[in-house]
């Protein structure tokens, strides 16, 4: 087992549904292949963007099978696990059964546990299999240094994904723990904050826009690493910040706006097909995104883009 967290740009594919509400398995496979062809360094299925909260166990298992058969070992495949502890452990074992590389331990939503409770929750999941595990901090699951230091002693834990955004805490974590684990930026629209995270030791991020304009996220990240401030600022102003402004207009847009972007560029998905409580993108916001992408793809064309 390679005890190392993925680095670079991480793909978090959405789960496409057909008009009857079932998983569109062909579309899922095609969209994962699109991410692979675009050079993403890892695939994380059935996580937040994949509407993990809405998936039945059978659907979850099907998604894993599709992901592993499509990826075929080209890059690491991770799954999302979380929710109630027994279900999280069950999904962790399903993931191990189907040969994935690891899983992202999602926050236990709506439960504000003490630090010891958070530790026991993560420990129970991480030690239930021999797979790599990445801890995800966001919303109501915010850890202190003592908790993180205890967690990194668990051999299965290879990474920490931050979706909380407290620079003071992150500096304390990275300075105290160093390279014992990998550091992943999991903030909403992670491209927005990646320039602040790189100097702290973060060398990967989950990219929502890579589901539909992966070449632009790649160009942005390469420019960051190369110190090309002109390109960074251009992509910030023309693509990233405008899309982020739309994303903030609706709850659930972290998912449905991805589907809208995919549909706009011609990928096989119906952006209206999301599961409650997520709702589709409103018409005005869809049109705003469409206009941004039209301009972006003129300036930054892609051979993989099928539309526009």
UniProtKB/Swiss-Prot annotation:
Pathway: Carbohydrate acid metabolism; D-glucarate degradation; 2,5-dioxopentanoate from D-glucarate: step 2/2. Transmembrane segments: none annotated. Gene3D superfamilies: Aldolase class I (3.20.20.70). The keyword Oxidoreductase does not apply. InterPro entries: Aldolase_TIM, DapA-like, Dehydro-deoxyglucarate_dehyd. Its EC number is 4.2.1.41. The keyword Lyase applies. It catalyses: 5-dehydro-4-deoxy-D-glucarate + H(+) = 2,5-dioxopentanoate + CO2 + H2O. HAMAP family: KDGDH. This is Probable 5-dehydro-4-deoxyglucarate dehydratase. It comes from Oceanobacillus iheyensis (strain DSM 14371 / CIP 107618 / JCM 11309 / KCTC 3954 / HTE831).
């Amino acid at each position: 087992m390679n005890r190392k967290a993925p680095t670079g740009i991480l793909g978090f594919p959405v789960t496409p549904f057909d008009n009857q509400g079932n998983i569109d398995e062909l579309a899922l496979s095609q969209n994962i292949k699109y991410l692979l062809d675009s050079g993403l360094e890892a695939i994380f299925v059935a996580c937040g963007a994949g509407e993990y909260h809405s998936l039945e166990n059978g659907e979850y298992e099907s998604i894993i099978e599709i992901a592993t058969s499509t990826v075929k070992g080209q890059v690491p495949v991770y799954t999302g696990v979380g929710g109630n502890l027994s279900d999280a452990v069950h999904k962790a074992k399903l993931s191990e059964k189907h040969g994935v590389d690891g899983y992202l331990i999602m926050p236990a939503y709506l439960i504000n546990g003490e630090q010891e409770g958070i530790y026991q929750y993560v420990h129970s999941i991480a030690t239930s299999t021999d797979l790599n595990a990445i801890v995800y901090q966001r919303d109501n699951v915010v850890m202190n240094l003592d908790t993180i230091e205890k967690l990194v002693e668990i051999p299965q834990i290879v990474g920490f994904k931050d979706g909380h955004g407290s620079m003071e805490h992150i500096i304390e974590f990275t300075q105290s723990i160093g390279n014992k684990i990998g550091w992943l930026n999991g903030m909403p629209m992670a491209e927005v904050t990646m320039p602040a995270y790189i100097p702290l030791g973060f060398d990967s991020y989950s990219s929502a826009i890579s589901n539909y304009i992966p070449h632009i996220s790649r160009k942005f990240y390469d420019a960051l690493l190369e110190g090309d401030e002109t390109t960074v600022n251009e992509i910030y102003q023309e693509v990233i910040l405008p899309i982020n402004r739309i994303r903030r207009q609706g709850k659930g847009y972290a998912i449905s706006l991805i589907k809208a972007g995919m549909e706009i560029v011609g990928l096989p998905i119906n952006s209206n097909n999301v599961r409650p409580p997520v709702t589709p993108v409103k018409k005005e916001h869809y049109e705003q995104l469409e206009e941004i992408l039209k301009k972006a793809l003129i300036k930054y064309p892609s051979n993989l883009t099928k539309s526009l």
